[in-house]
Amino acid sequence: MKTSEIRKKFLDFFASKGHQVVPSSSLIPGNDPTLMFTVAGMVQFKDVFLGFEKRDYTRATTSQKCLRAGGKHNDLENVGYTARHHTFFEMLGNFSFGDYFKRDAITFAWEFLTGEQWLALPKDKLMVTVYATDDEAYDIWHQTVGLPADKIVRIGDNKGAPYASDNFWTMGDTGPCGPCTEIFFDHGPSVAGGPPGSPDEDGDRFMEIWNNVFMQFNRDEAGTLHPLPKPSVDTGMGLERLSTVLQHVKSNYETDALACLVRAAARETGVEYSQDVPSLKVIADHIRACSFMVADGILPSNEGRGYVLRRIARRAIRHGYKLGQKGLFFHKIVADLVAEMGEAYPELREKQAHIEDALRAEEIKFAETLEIGMGLVDSALEGGKTALDGDTIFKLYDTFGFPVDLTADICRERGIHADLEGFERAMEAQRERGRAGSNFKMSGKIAYDGEDTRFHGYDKSSVEAKVLALYKGTDPVDSLSAGDEGIVVLDGTAFYAEGGGQVGDVGEISAAGGIAALFDVADTQKIQGAAFGHKGKLARGALKVGDAVTATIDLHQRQASARNHSATHLLHAALRHVLGGHVVQKGSLVNPERTRFDFAHGEAVTAAQIAELERVVNHVIAANYEVKAELMSMEAAQKSGAMMLFGEKYGDEVRVLTMGDFSAELCGGTHVKRTGDIGLFKIVAEGGVAAGVRRIEAVTGEGALAYIQAQDALIKEAAAALKAQTSDEVLAKIAALQDSAKALEKELAKLKGQLASSAGDSLADAAADINGVKVLAAELPGADNTALRETLDKLKDKLGSAAIVLAAKGDGKVALVAGVTADLTGKLKAGELVNFVAQQVGGKGGGRPDMAQAGGTQPENLDAALNGVQAWVAGKL
């Protein structure tokens, strides 16, 4: 039975038992900031189990995509070396939210596993465990199901504390908990291992395939269990494990869903297909994890989920390198994955090109340093060393992009120790340098426990209000005097407090028409809950708590912010239209001058794409759609398809902003009435802000017109300088200047090469003879990297058995190349030689045993460094 058939049978079975088939949630947990990834089927239902959320069903079933590769849920180092460990896997589950309990959960499981129309597993091949005191579950298995007593094992508190058991589940030290019953498949006596609960239970003979958790109690801080009024059921069954049973194989990687990826890995790395090559299994597992992560909006980066993706991808790439594949290969396996799993998970098909592009870009990035880094490992382990030192591990991490677990993998394969404690010391030293270099101060937080501020700013620019509180800095005061800087809290306001990327409003707060008091508001922020703090300076008069005031915004500034905020929504929708559905917002800043929008995308936006974005947005502006804001329930907003930001906290009621049928987003900001009010939209900048994150800056309305006029003036000024009359003439004259510059640069490079070459010819006579080896360390003034390499090759040919270092200074930097002839690489390594010099001039480098390059930033130390080369070489011979 194919894996896809097993998945379908499971969902069909529980649908026939009244369960709602719920699609898999994202690998990014939407409701649990404590988890980096979705690690189990119950994650998307956590708030339902805790009573914080209600759904219109009480029974559910899912096939949930899961990832375990970060934090305490981390199987990464075992993947590829065991039959069952994975980073990505699918978990089948059925759930009861205060509906059925133990009897139905157990009989459902038994019927699905053994029923002739379902999986029809042999009953004598199954055995179960129950919690030691769970007599109810034991009796259901023994009396209702009819399982013999010798097939039921009671498991007690086997982890050193009350209720610390393989068969007792807890959500934490307190809260929902309960016993569980696990179902095992017996592979037979030909496989090593004993039954659960026995001393040799860790063998492979008895394999757990299904776990039924019974959320029956609430544990208080004293450790006492109290029965829950509505007990629930949470079950999980690994699809890959179940497939091994039904396909009569011993390893998950032999199942149809994974074997096809192992074959694809063999094809792309150029090796023969075999289940005995761990590297092929690593690649097969990791292509699933990486592809699903990218499909769910994660891109490789140096932090958080993006770094986990980078670690997994680079581990796979390194295993390809280990098999001899030095070219790009990993992204080519995405198509095989889509063919296998695209029907069950349509997001793979929809985002295939994006996934391939993201993984290909990561391959290219790592390829730049992989070979050099591996050479550094080889050099560090010369002389039969049994450990890789922490400083080298840190250098691999910091300079060459080797995740620490990847380096640990390499050490494990070679049977040597990885000095991870030394690595941590090097990391801490870097953190200390970072802390010493930083110079920031935390701003104080205001303590406020009064009433909230009512916001009237969607339809009013001025409101009458009462002063609820006043502050100087973070200290509460009864009054402010002329010249005082402070914060004013009102019971009502037209001022928008900074949020959702939009800056706070500015304006004034006045008493008695500004005669009694006039407070200039420079910013508005939420200081506690929904209480708004109006920050500014009292220009005249006095202001006291309890005063009646008028709060009036700067309408011109507000309208400019509104234009830019509405344009941001249009840009977001246009980005998804032009670049693809993978685009998600990563941050924004909206102020009266411009809008700045950060979004997930793996490469620079091209000039043609920017032009298309501008065309699309301005087309919607010209259409003059009405901008509608509507309050609705969160559930209704989700069903409407409105865009919402991952990680943003929303209440039960949300504000949905729509612009025709082009854009719909959850937003609490201020906006124009119609899209035509934006006037004009112009992108002024595009660039990268982090790995996989791009930023676009744009202006609107009068700001866009001013930008275009400034660009026009610049072009006219350039034309005058070039003595050109038309734009065509400007381009022609620029092209002519470029051609002339290229010709001069080419001639200059040729002359430099000739000078360096002639200098190199004369240098051969300066080589010292040390034990029959020619040793030369010299500076070539004016040489570039190409000239250094060409001269090095000539000298190696001319000198025979030789070790050579050549250097050049320029722009406050040092360029270095080192070469060792082939007959000496067993004793001398070019990488070690070049680093000996580079470290003395403030640099580092690497390369092959016969040729290496480096750079430095301390040219004043070059002469001394070169003078030490002869002694260094003599010490190695």
From Swiss-Prot:
Organism annotation: Chromobacterium violaceum (strain ATCC 12472 / DSM 30191 / JCM 1249 / CCUG 213 / NBRC 12614 / NCIMB 9131 / NCTC 9757 / MK)
Domain remark in the UniProt entry: Consists of three domains; the N-terminal catalytic domain, the editing domain and the C-terminal C-Ala domain. The editing domain removes incorrectly charged amino acids, while the C-Ala domain, along with tRNA(Ala), serves as a bridge to cooperatively bring together the editing and aminoacylation centers thus stimulating deacylation of misacylated tRNAs.
Classification via CDD domains: AlaRS_core
TM annotation in the entry: none
Co-factor remark: Binds 1 zinc ion per subunit.
The protein's name: Alanine--tRNA ligase
HAMAP family associated with the record: Ala_tRNA_synth_B
Keyword annotations: Aminoacyl-tRNA synthetase, ATP-binding, Cytoplasm, Ligase, Metal-binding, Nucleotide-binding, Protein biosynthesis, RNA-binding, tRNA-binding, Zinc
Location in or out of the cell: Cytoplasm
Biological role stated in the UniProt entry: Catalyzes the attachment of alanine to tRNA(Ala) in a two-step reaction: alanine is first activated by ATP to form Ala-AMP and then transferred to the acceptor end of tRNA(Ala). Also edits incorrectly charged Ser-tRNA(Ala) and Gly-tRNA(Ala) via its editing domain.
BP GO terms, sorted: alanyl-tRNA aminoacylation; negative regulation of DNA-templated transcription
